[in-house]
Amino acid sequence: MKAAEIREKFLKFFESKGHTIVRSSSLVPGNDPTLLFTNSGMVQFKDVFLGAETRPYSRATTAQRSVRAGGKHNDLENVGYTARHHTFFEMLGNFSFGDYFKRDAIHYAWELLTSVYKLPADKLWVTVYHDDDEAYDIWAKEVGVPAERIIRIGDNKGARYASDNFWQMGDTGPCGPCSEIFYDHGPDVWGGPPGSPEEDGDRYIEIWNLVFMQFNRDAQGNMTRLPKPCVDTGMGLERIAAVLQHVHSNYEIDLFQQLIKASARETGVADLANNSLKVIADHIRACSFLIVDGVIPGNEGRGYVLRRIVRRAIRHGYKLGRKAPFFHKLVADLVAEMGAAYPELKEAEPRVTDVLRQEEERFFETIEHGMSILEAALAELDAAGGKTLDGELAFKLHDTYGFPLDLTADVCRERGVTVDEPAFDDAMARQREQARAAGKFKATQGLEYTGAKTTFHGYEEIAFDDAKVVALYVEGASVGEVKAGESAVVVLDHTPFYAESGGQVGDQGVLANAATRFAVGDTLKVQADVIGHHGELEQGTLKVGDVVRAEIDAARRARTARNHSATHLMHKALRDVLGSHVQQKGSLVDADKTRFDFAHNAPLTDDEIRRVEAIVNEQVLANAPGIVRVMPYDDAVKGGAMALFGEKYGDEVRVLDLGFSRELCGGTHVHRTGDIGLFKIVAEGGVAAGIRRVEAITGDNAVRYVQALDARVNAAAAALKAQPSELLQRIGQVQDQVKSLEKELGALKSKLASSQGDELAQQAVEVGGVHVLAATLDGADAKTLRETVDKLKDKLKSAAIVLAAVDGGKVSLIAGVTADASKKVKAGELVNFVAQQVGGKGGGRPDMAQAGGTEPAKLPAALAGVKGWVEARL
């Protein structure tokens, strides 16, 4: 049974049991900022289990794409060397949200394994938590598993509930016992049943884990039963496929074998059991799906983990003799294997291929030099009998040649060498300390606030008359009052001030009453629904309990709103022009501009920029109203609203319809698209691999920009004595004139050089039968110097010549030696002799060479020494 069929049978089986098939969520968790990657099926349902989210179904089943590389779950160093470690894997799961519990979960699992997958019942063993009698009885009395194949697993980690068979989400929250199902490969394979001293062997392989969430643990460790217990199960597709295909290694299943063959094709390796091929086959899956989900290779966070995986794959290809980009060519093979199950992979194939190709090309620029340094260091270490690589060298490889530490460690491990990681960490810490730039620290986290939420009125109002001061902070500490001249954070019960969020800067303005005036320079969130006004008290004394009028800088807010609304229109226009792969990666919206970072692999062409501008300005001219609606998140997404990648949304979301754009957004916006006035892109560039940045301006800023541009065009036209409409034609004429004059100048220089050459020939001194000449040719360029040297060589027949010219404090040198003399006098050595004395260097052929220098004052003495230098070599 092939992996694709196993996946389909799993989902269809649970669908027949009343489960809703839910698509795999992104590898980048949208609901858990503490998690680097989605690493199990339950991640997308975490808020459902916690009661913070509801779904329209109580039973679900998924085939969840998962990654374990980096952070707590890091299998990277083992991948390719063991039978079951992967960076990317698929987790098959079924879930109950307060619906069925242990009995149905156990019976469903047994039915699928024995009746659908046709596994022999006598090959299956199960474990239960040691005091979970309910699960034990279901397995023994209802399913009929013999007692000798049901194993109770206790608290084997030194603390209550610290067991492989007791699952917990964290120190507090939902938790409960679990029951694992194992497959027995038989006595021909070494290993013992779970719980035995030999359990790490390969005979008994865990294939399915059934988690029964039935308790809630509080901060004191007390357990209370959940009113609606839940079920979370997980079965690795690769593991069950290995069992059903009668192989012992996941890399032997059909899915991996096709990728291993493709890796062998691209690297030219015949041995399909080679571990490096397994590494490459595994890594193309992780890399491709991470890019599908918007991760781009970079130097931090998820992007850095992706870069590590890509470069590890490249290094293994390099180890196999592949010294050119190859990894990206495997994307097509992956699409052939998994594109049907995951259409998003097939849709993104060109982009994934391009991102990987660019990353490969970037790494291949340095890998050879870095590998040679590492190989030399390992050879020296081996000769000295050492077993630890210097951490400083590992850091140099990381910092200069782009070798992630684990890639260096990977190479070392193959030689039985370890890396001095503490020394590496010290070097990294020193660099970070040196590179740390001073900047404004926006500290709102850590302020101890336990009062009521702030009521925000800024969507409708620019001022609020009776705002009460409910908290004050000076230098992070809560205070009762603030005096004139002090900087502080003010929390109000009501405010029109928008707090920085979603890329939009916070409002500025004033908090005032008859006796006090507090200038707000920035507005930030103290907590999710608590707004802090940062600024300075300009007069009076401000106390907790005071009532003030809170008024924003309305003109600044209006400019910011124009830019924010333009960002929405630009985002949609970029997707229309460049493709649906465009995803927002960051933004900054303030009163002056909008800065928008997005996923795209190539610079925008002038035509693409013009098309984006035209589309946005069409929307501006349409003067469409901005319509805001608050609705459930699922309804918003089903209605076509764009949810920004990586953002976390609540159950209720704010949807903004603006012209042809529909996005989830909590920012402030124009009432109609016409309020934007004018949209103009002023800059476009790259900020990281696969990430482009566009800056644009709107309204009066855009008008001033166009006016300034128009003024420069008019000034340029006037300087060239042309009308603005004729400017390009006139520039072309001037360029033609310049080329003609340069040609005339070249001819004159050549003629001058010819005449000077005749004069210079007379200055040559004969040394050992060779005419030696070292002279300065005033006003000559490099071409003229070369032509003059050639003519002098023809005229003098046997000669060693150095000619120099000085221009703008720089020295140009040309040396020429005739063929008969070049066996003893090399032009490259001769020109270097002079160049080194004038602060430069150079080189070339034995008969002709050139150099430069930066110290013209030393030129006469350097030329004077040429005769003696040549004489010494003849």
Curated annotation (Swiss-Prot):
GO MF annotation list: alanine-tRNA ligase activity; aminoacyl-tRNA deacylase activity; ATP binding; tRNA binding; zinc ion binding
Coiled-coil segments on the chain, per record: none
Positions bound to Zn(2+): H564, H568, C665, H669
InterPro entries named among the record's database cross-references: aa-tRNA-synth_II/BPL/LPL, Ala-tRNA-lgiase_IIc, Ala-tRNA-ligase_IIc_anticod-bd, Ala-tRNA-synth_IIc_core, Ala-tRNA-synth_IIc_N, Ala-tRNA_ligase, Ala_tRNA_ligase_euk/bac, DHHA1_dom
Keywords of this entry: Aminoacyl-tRNA synthetase, ATP-binding, Cytoplasm, Ligase, Metal-binding, Nucleotide-binding, Protein biosynthesis, RNA-binding, tRNA-binding, Zinc
Any GO CC annotation of this UniProt entry: cytosol
Function: Catalyzes the attachment of alanine to tRNA(Ala) in a two-step reaction: alanine is first activated by ATP to form Ala-AMP and then transferred to the acceptor end of tRNA(Ala). Also edits incorrectly charged Ser-tRNA(Ala) and Gly-tRNA(Ala) via its editing domain.
Family of this protein: Belongs to the class-II aminoacyl-tRNA synthetase family.
Domain notes: Consists of three domains; the N-terminal catalytic domain, the editing domain and the C-terminal C-Ala domain. The editing domain removes incorrectly charged amino acids, while the C-Ala domain, along with tRNA(Ala), serves as a bridge to cooperatively bring together the editing and aminoacylation centers thus stimulating deacylation of misacylated tRNAs.
Protein name according to UniProt: Alanine--tRNA ligase
